[in-house]
């Protein structure tokens, strides 16, 4: 529910890019814990009526959130939908071949894909437009963010604040708790 008590039908999910977290391989153990934390936060939204999860498909939290949605769709919530709305054509052009292949697979599995700008990257304004566009068209923002470590999520947060949209934070402490719980479960 948002702060007015209305259901969140569409939720924008974002956070740090992989390199901002020091993650340069999909096999990094941190990815597992980040996905598990995202899943823990998405489940209550879905159970309360969220129908669409929206991302721009950037490397890092947004793509891991897409993976979580695919998994939840397969195992527990077949009705949940994922939209990937890249800021411009060819967002992945400068990514590694492996990252491009994973991105293409995620796009193929998404329920809706459309570039916000039908042109290739031309200027930084396209990224600001993406942030404002996605925040405007969703009911709330779920963001992995640490106020002590500013980075790319700050732009989404600023847009959400300016538009009066509810912001739901995933803190580093939540991720650490997921790690502890997972290790405890493995110990048992």
UniProtKB/Swiss-Prot annotation:
Cleaved signal peptide residues: none
Pfam families: YpsA
InterPro entries reported for this sequence: YspA
Membrane-traversing stretches: none
Xref: SUPFAM superfamilies: MCP/YpsA-like
Domain of life the protein comes from: Bacteria
Family annotation (Gene3D superfamilies): 3.40.50.450
NCBIfam families noted in UniProt: PRK13660.1
Family the entry assigns: Belongs to the UPF0398 family.
HAMAP family: UPF0398
Protein name: UPF0398 protein ABC2016
Lineage of the organism: Bacteria, Bacillati, Bacillota, Bacilli, Bacillales
